[in-house]
Amino acid sequence: MSLLTEVETPIRNEWGCRCNGSSDPLVIAASIIGILHLILWILDRLLFKCIYRRFKYGLKRGPSTEGVPESMREEYRKEQQSAVDADDGHFVNIEPE
């Protein structure tokens, strides 16, 4: 017996599936999850550039300085710059003679 005859059987002169009309909760849950997965995948492909560009560039901002006095903001900037300047000494400059 072939796989085709085990899965699909002729019903009233039509081809149908044995699982039609199944009220098994597992089948219903799997169908819902499958449909939601398909919808989310399609949205992801359509909005790929918008979504990932937002994550890539939108989240690279520094900590919020809202409500922080200007003097503390300037001090923070100096600390960040001095950390960058200190790290520059790590690299060796090789100059051709």
Swiss-Prot record:
GO terms of molecular function: monoatomic ion channel activity; proton transmembrane transporter activity
Q: Which species does the entry assign this protein to?
A: Influenza A virus (strain A/USA:Phila/1935 H1N1)
**What domain comment accompanies this record?**
Cytoplasmic tail plays an important role in virion assembly and morphogenesis.
Q: Which Gene3D superfamilies match?
A: 6.10.250.1640
Glycosylation, residue list: N20
Q: Does the keyword Amino-acid biosynthesis apply?
A: no
Alphabetic keyword roster: Disulfide bond, Glycoprotein, Host cell membrane, Host membrane, Host-virus interaction, Hydrogen ion transport, Inhibition of host autophagy by virus, Ion channel, Ion transport, Lipoprotein, Membrane, Palmitate, Phosphoprotein, Signal-anchor, Transmembrane, Transmembrane helix, Transport, Viral ion channel, Virion
Intravirion topological segments: 44-97
Compartments where found:
Virion membrane; Host apical cell membrane
Mind telling me what this protein is named?
Matrix protein 2
The entry's cellular-component GO terms read:
host cell plasma membrane; membrane; virion membrane
Lipid (S-palmitoyl cysteine) linked to which residue positions?
C50
